[in-house]
């Protein structure tokens, strides 16, 4: 058995895939999850479950003792919420606690899960973005949290002299996805006949590939590098057409300008506040994605 690796956010979609890849490589895994977390993605896996809160420094420090590497997945994955702080705080405090724990435990590297949200998109449909690009927009709290927490993580890496590798997955789809997230909700809304697409292009990655690449980064990742984990870039319209082809359900497309899309999104947000249900499109999503191209 190889060394122990601590995986935060272990019960999530990406965590379940990462852990399987680590186990295949012979690593011992500590799965850091919140109390009462949904553990369906970890059923029957030979892992040590550690309960705690990423915002609680003491529990993260205890979990990291004896580990060689930390893979930090834990984050609040929501594109719409009552407050920005509910999404920002766990991201920022989580980064602080992970690096403090790594320093205390003498851990040599942290594999830090960021997101292509931290790179963003461009109005130029021909431009290819790279790992040198940063997204400083505040349109979507989750995206802004990813940018700021990753930037903080690089600072903490220097402060604590702990090596860091940042992995930036695109939209993740695939196996061991048991909960409703912004990624799969978009598809579910389409299947239910209430989803709609806007003019843009985004990049995707299979969950198995994303997990395998996190496991590979433990051994092969170069300290100090950002790696984009994204495959084919696809227009939302093409995605909707694919869903329609597979499900037989018509998916609406909004070939409107940004200003009209924003107006539609405002209406949906107003309805959402009354129904207490997350809207399929928000003003932030439109500003971030409408007529924007995320190609890497």
Q: What positions do the PLM features span?
A:
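Active-site YXXXK catalytic motif of short-chain dehydrogenase/reductase
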Residues: 142-147
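Conserved Rossmann-fold NAD(P)-dependent oxidoreductase catalytic core, especially the SDR/UDP-sugar
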Residues: 72, 76, 82-141
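Conserved beta-loop-beta element that borders a ligand/cofactor-binding pocket
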Residues: 114, 149-175
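Mid/C-terminal beta-alpha module of Rossmann-like enzyme folds, strongest
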Residues: 213-280
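NAD(P)H-binding glycine-rich loop region in Rossmannoid oxidoreductase-like domains
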Residues: 36-93, 101
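N-terminal Rossmann NAD(P)H-binding glycine-rich loop of SDR-like oxidoreductase domains
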Residues: 3-27
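A conserved pocket-lining segment of Rossmann-fold NAD(P)-dependent short-chain dehydrogenase/reductase
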Residues: 136-138, 185-209, 213
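Glycine/proline-rich active-site loop of Rossmann-fold NAD(P)-dependent oxidoreductases
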Residues: 159-162, 174-185, 217-227, 249-251
């Amino acid at each position: 058995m190889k060394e122990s690796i601590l995986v935060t956010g272990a019960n999530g979609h990406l965590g379940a895939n990462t852990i399987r890849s680590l186990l295949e490589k012979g690593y011992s895994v500590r799965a850091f999850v919140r109390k009462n977390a949904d553990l369906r993605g970890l059923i029957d896996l030979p892992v040590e479950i550690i309960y705690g809160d990423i915002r609680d420094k003491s529990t993260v420090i205890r979990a990291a003792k004896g580990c060689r590497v930390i893979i930090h997945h834990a984050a609040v994955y929501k594109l719409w919420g009552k407050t920005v702080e509910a999404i920002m705080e766990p991201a920022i405090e989580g980064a602080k606690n992970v690096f403090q724990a790594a320093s205390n435990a003498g851990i040599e590297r942290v594999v830090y899960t960021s997101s292509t949200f931290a790179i963003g998109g461009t109005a130029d449909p021909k431009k290819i973005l790279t790992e040198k690009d940063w997204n400083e927009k505040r349109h979507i709290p989750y995206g802004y949290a990813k940018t700021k927490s990753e930037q903080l993580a690089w600072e903490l890496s220097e402060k604590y002299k702990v090596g860091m590798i940042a992995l930036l997955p695109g939209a993740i789809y695939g196996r061991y996805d048991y909960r409703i997230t912004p990624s799969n909700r978009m598809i579910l809304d389409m299947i239910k006949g209430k989803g709609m697409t806007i003019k843009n292009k985004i990049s995707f990655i299979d969950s198995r590939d994303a997990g395998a690449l996190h496991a590979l980064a433990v051994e092969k990742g170069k300290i100090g590098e950002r790696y984009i984990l994204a495959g084919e870039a696809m227009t939302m319209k093409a995605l909707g057409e694919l869903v329609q082809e597979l499900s037989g359900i018509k998916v609406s497309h909004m070939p409107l300008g940004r200003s009209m899309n924003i107006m539609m999104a405002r209406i949906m947000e107003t309805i959402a506040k009354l129904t207490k249900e997350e809207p399929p499109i928000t003003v932030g999503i439109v500003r971030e994605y409408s007529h924007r191209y995320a190609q890497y």
